[in-house]
């Protein structure tokens, strides 16, 4: 059998040659050769190694680094169920075009179907949820196989970036001679693959009542479209993680405005990113009487209503004339009225609410800050916050919009962006990824502040059909799911500083200083009146 140490060295050398600079490792026995080579590469400053004991969290940490940095990031595990624990992060990476590189250690192929310990058929475990997968058995093939996987991960030729899987068969002995760890890695080269040309640009004609709908997108993309919409006087309906939600064109109450008369007059929608948050937007994107232009650099695109008229790499908005400026002013006037109503409602609502927490958190952050927002209610609460001239970089896992792995993702975003991160999460989201509060004493701690909106359960369900009075009897047990967990004790178990607040003033004080290390701010809110608040917000102005 090939030498396991040489194989591991070939894999790490090829990852480095292909531009990988961050690797997340979950320890194990079969992956020992990879772990030791990665440790040496980290020691020598060749890469940055992050060690976590929970594979699910490790996968989301790698996802966060890749999401914020735009570079491929590897996550390394041992064999067996360890690999399967990466599946949620792989799914999110697939649907959000994130270059996540799974490197799984495996037993030699001859041991499959023999009952050997921690041995299963894991080469194609992720099936259709990775862009490419291969098995590596020989160090001589490492640069070729890893190079092609990295091309698939970055979408350089396919224009479809996403996760890939390298399964590495490692035979005993698994621990190399210590002298090998001091030797330089082999010099390898991966094939240079230039990015596929992007050249389809559509120039949009004037005279059509146009809006831009911006969904989840990287900061550079969102900020570009915020500037374009402002220059063209086009109303901008931007979700928080679109990174377009700032400037004069963005409308903070757009999902409420879509329930009024303005929506009926829309003649064209330009879609950027991946919109997922609201039913009013979905209804708009499903209309057959509206010209729907989808702009994407990828080979897949957002079209949930199956109504797209054209999909292009880029679009040019027309120069604004009197008609365009009048159209924009109608939206701005409606926005001002809706904003005043929403703010008055929240200011007068008894007790602290999720939307109030969201607008307070946003107000505390500047354009150089980073915000990770959780799924469920937090991102929707942020979607009602006022729009300012600038905004922080906002990240979210909107590929599949799960609530798992978000603490780990926030930590990854901090490493990938190089900025302190504030994360706005629900209590159940924190509990889903509580293992991420456990960071070993040998691992550096990034500056991540977790603002946990604790309403003791799943309050988003109160705003949906099952939150109606007809379902009151089963609601708490099967939807509300109160847990009664002491978040202070949970944080203390991981050595994480904790602060509990119950008022807006206390929250503002807690947010006044930038994050230092990993810390938790628990914000206590009442879930009992969440449905009433949602109905009041959606009521006609």
Predicted features along the sequence, with ranges:
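Phosphate/pyrophosphate-binding active-site segments
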Residues: 1-3, 283-377, 486, 495, ...
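Cofactor-/ligand-binding subdomain signature composed of acidic, glycine-rich
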Residues: 1-18, 143-205, 320-333
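N-terminal cofactor/phosphate-binding cores enriched in small/glycine residues
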Residues: 3-88, 385
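Active-site diphosphate/adenylate-binding microenvironment
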Residues: 8-12, 29-35, 332-418
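Structural signature of the thiamine diphosphate
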Residues: 19-22, 67-77, 83-88, 92-104, ...
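Glycine-rich, anion-gripping cofactor-binding loops and their flanking helix/strand elements
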Residues: 63, 67, 78-79, 214-307, ...
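Thiamine diphosphate
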Residues: 92-93, 103, 110-123, 381, ...
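Glycine-rich, acidic loop regions that bind phosphate or pyrophosphate groups
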Residues: 93, 104-149, 238-339, 440
